[in-house]
Amino acid sequence: LFDTPPDLDIVRNIYSSIQNVIAVGDPRQTTYSTHHSQKYKKYSEGKVRNFFCEHLGELCEIDEITLSKSHRNEQIVCAISSQLFPELTPSVSCECCDDSHIEHLGAFYVPESKHLKYLEQYNPIQLRWDSRNSKVNPKFIAMNIGSSKGLTLDRVLLYPTKNMIDWLNDENTQLVQQTQSKFYVGLTRAKYSLGILVADNELSKLRQIIPIYE
């Protein structure tokens, strides 16, 4: 894990002294920062790719294709989540994982009026921004989006913030970096199904990119 200015200096020294180095990372999942140093500040908030281009351009090449296939997410989830970062190579669902025998695959808007029914039917992990979310049902497992980073969950019910809802209405909505990254993490935890809880009166305003759970 490299996320401080001294770490980036170490990375530069490694590339300068070792012939074959492979570094792997996903700038879309920069959900938090442990430092606020001015050095290399312009490479914070998921901009570490620029560090490699500007400081290590002659020592390495950036490959955005080899690991662009997801072995976790359904294609619709890959498509939606990739829209959050249009400047990056979109991810696509792999062809080696056949989940066609699984019921209820993909992504769905879940009306608040069907909230409990959805939880009881599919028992998804509830992902929220933080513990202050009053819509979370305490009878079912819940966790913060940031804590779910790196996990693969069979089914997820995401509790979007207002800004996330705004983006689902208009993909040109500007999100601050932390919201953008946490939204990406929340969207991409589920292997089989992703539910997004939405107030009934908001459903007609959203982009019809996924079906509504009935």
What are these model-predicted stretches?
Residues 1-185, 189-214:
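Conserved helicase motor core of SF1/SF2 NTP-dependent helicases
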